[in-house]
Amino acid sequence: MLDNKFGFKQRVASLRWLSAAIMLSVSAVPAWAFSIDDVAQQAEKLSQKGFEAPKSNLPAQFRDMKFADYQQIRFNNDKSYWNNVQTPFKLQFYHQGMYFDTPVKINEVTATTVDEIKYSPEYFDFGSVNHDAEAVKNLGFAGFKVLYPINKADKNDEIVSMLGASYFRVVGKGQIYGLSARGLAIDTALPSGEEFPRFREFWIERPKPNDKHLVIYALLDSPRAAGAYRFTVYPGRDSVVDVQAKVFLRDKVGKLGIAPLTSMYLFGPNQPSPTLNYRPALNDSNGLSIHAGNGEWIWRPLNNPKHLSVSTYAVENPKGFGLLQRGRDFTAYEDLDDRYDLRPSGWVEPKGEWGKGKVELVEIPTADETNDNIVAFWTPDVLPETGKPLDIKYRLHFTRDEDQLHSPNIAYVQQTRRSAGDVKQSNLIRQPDGTIAYIVDFVGPNLKELDESTPVASQVSIGDNGEIVENNVRYNPVTHGWRLTLRLRVKDAKQPTEMRAALVNGETTLTETWSNQLPANE
């Protein structure tokens, strides 16, 4: 009896302790946590209502200012958000001005609260720009940037910039801003005109002291779409952004661009400058790379065409695609001011199966380097029904290590060079013959392993607008790879000419596919 009573009391005590422990653990778990579902609820509600165009509250003085004046408005570094919080991440904000004339709402998310970060003119140094502090006191921000000690432990540098429509830029260690990513592209290059969705509101999680990543939520809105986004930024040698998106269509669209990248290409070795220029190349990216679902790797050198050009690549369940800057030697660019050799490549790594669709490349004519004239994205063959969410997940890589962005088992295109075609005469003088020549160097570990006497051959095809008059493959002792020389004759110069090539050894494919376009009127 004594043992039984003691056992009973012990069990009661144990139950009381367990009950207290459960209550303690429940109270330790936040009753509420912000997530993409909260943003998705707003996006879905927006999609069920008519679109309300954002209204500008910007005084004319700021809207009409020139770029040089806008540059004078600088954020006060000593007022960086989270300056007094134990975290390596800091926030700074963009002032409205010029075409950045619509405010976005920016919120801070903590474990228990969501609070708007209010605009104040005290955040900014206006330089010589005269302004009425009273007129701008409730102006709102144009966007924001994220700072992090990515290059030096004692120095905060920009790693993320979110400014304008749904554009954002990201850099890793030792990189400078180049190409941009976007949340969504709608009807790009269609005759009806492109629609530019915009991020209208952001929620930024306050990072914990030891966090090495930053979480940003965004609400996207446009006349025919609304969406919720979650960006998880991992700064590093290669900065990585995990993207989760839930998109709701308000109305039918002609084309939906998923994971769009935007860049600039003015000229390069495959399309030399029409005027004398000491720079061998001037571009943020020089090619589109695609890793198709069937395992094929494709490299498409970029062009600056005289007319709008759209190239499509049917890709089911893509493994990756991106706009790359291949070739990192300073001598490839020779620009001390803009350092195109330090600009990152952007690579999209889809998560899960995206289904049937196309990678689309849009090339737009530009006369100078101030215009982004290159767009690449994946577009699904079957668009989501109006009101039903399209769930997309992918990872963005911003890197200068292009070697990781192609298969180690096949060679890749190191460079593409274009020139007037010629034929060496009996007197050893080269005589132009009216053709166009392409020099394509393939390199890679698998080619280095081959003896130079290996019978490497080419598989080449050309569209109806061209004729191959020379197809020559030879060992390149400088690169320990193989060089392909193609000379082609164009039938109608007013039309583009498409060509493809790869190197093989018997039945074995040795290289990625070089997919090239000679633009019209070149």
UniProtKB/Swiss-Prot annotation:
The keyword Signal applies. It comes from the Bacteria. GO terms for biological process: beta-glucan biosynthetic process. Pathway: Glycan metabolism; osmoregulated periplasmic glucan (OPG) biosynthesis. GO terms for molecular function: carbohydrate binding; catalytic activity. It is found in: Periplasm. The keyword Signal applies. Coiled coil: none annotated. Residues 1-33 form the signal peptide. Keywords: Periplasm, Signal. GO terms for cellular component: outer membrane-bounded periplasmic space. Its main location: periplasm. Involved in the biosynthesis of osmoregulated periplasmic glucans (OPGs). PANTHER family: GLUCANS BIOSYNTHESIS PROTEIN, GLUCANS BIOSYNTHESIS PROTEIN G. Belongs to the OpgD/OpgG family. This is Glucans biosynthesis protein G. It comes from Pectobacterium carotovorum subsp. carotovorum (strain PC1). The gene is mdoG.
